[in-house]
Amino acid sequence: MNHTMRPFLFIAMACAVAWAASARAQVPQSGPSFHEAVGMAWAIDPVRIELQVGHHSARARVSAAGSWFAGGPTLSGEYMDDHMLGSNEGYTTYQGGVSVPLWLPGQGSATQQVASAEAASLDEQLNVEHMALSIRVLDAAAASLIARTRVDVAHTLYDAMARMAASATHAVHGGELASTDGQMAQAAMENAHNELALAQEEAENAAASLEALLGRPVVPDLARYGEGDVTHARFIAPRDMEDNDPRIKVAHRNVEAAEANMKLARRSFMPNPEIGVDAIHEKQYGSPWDDRVGLNFSIPLPSEVRNTPIMSEARNRLASATSQETQARRMVHLEMMRVRERLIAATTVRQATRTAADSMERRAAAQEHAWRVGEAGLDTVIAARQAAGGTRMASARADVEWHVASIRMLIATGIVP
């Protein structure tokens, strides 16, 4: 039994050395700041490109709405003679004209107001996307840091289990320990090895997700943000924070655009009239060619069949925009409360878990020492080491979540630190 365990122990220790080298190789350098990371993600964000194209299009509509006429010119032409089907007396007429649609009273300025309001809404949508992207980067960075911490904790536990397994194997070989205790130590080491493999997988997945956002294999340094960065945020009134939120701003811009559209619908109470110039060139029987020039106009009359759907659509748009603004204010208000409470809770949890982690680590060290001098059982030591690893992981997670809550508080105030 002792001879079969010795080669297995050597293999396990070799694996531990290999895992240690891998972990050291993966220790990140000092990463970019969170602000720089958001800039990396913003530079390659496809939604940003889409919104910017829409923004340029909206500005083009604003410029086009300043035209003198409500549309492009219309060309018309006619040709008539009596050669084929008529009396064949030599009558020939050429007639052509050009006309343009005119704005109704106030319709041109109302059209410009609608285009300007929609362009302003797209500006705020860019800010909303930037805020949403900042939160996605923050969550991905936190997940990556927590995953790396899990690797460190799992590696520390594996080293401790491997060390205890080596001691147990030596004791079993010397007849100082029962073989069942040696098997228990080997099983604990294998469990720690399995946890390390799972932690490595989680870290790789989290790093891949973050790299997809940033375009680079880097992890932003969140630890530099903390108490000092959110001091001024505590003195900002919740109402001011809500009004400064881009989601409320874009909802308000949409209401303004809907109101401008309602005004435009009222101004468009009839189809646009047209005015133009006509020219006639004709030849009559026994007479020389005759040329004439005149004006033409066309005035379609108002109709409920046309106007009712236009007004109904404008009213529906305004009602929907107003409802969405109210819902956005409620959602942002609740989120602000959650962000504040989360920061308070994260601060408390961070302090508590840090103290617990220190205490459990000292307890595990004391239990291992007691086991080596024969004053404690192996199962007690293994349980103490596992508990110490769990509290250390909880402490590290709480520390990352505290930094995340601090940054999230800054984002809520409109600042990307």
Predicted regions and their residues:
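Periplasmic alpha-helical coiled-coil/stalk elements that build and connect Gram-negative outer-membrane
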Residues: N2-H3, E129-N244, V339-A346, A366, ...
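Amphipathic alpha-helical coiled-coil segments
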Residues: V38, R48-A65, E129, L133-Y158, ...
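Small/polar-residue-enriched beta-strand and adjacent coil segments characteristic
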Residues: S30-F34, G71-E129, K249-E256, N261, ...
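Acidic, low-complexity, intrinsically disordered peripheral segments
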Residues: H3-R6, F10, R24-V27, A394-P417
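Bacterial Sec-pathway N-terminal export signals of envelope proteins
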Residues: A23-S76, P101-W103, A110, A141, ...
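Outer-membrane beta-barrel domain signature
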Residues: G86, T92-T93, Q183, N194-A197, ...
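Bacterial N-terminal signal peptides
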Residues: F10-A18
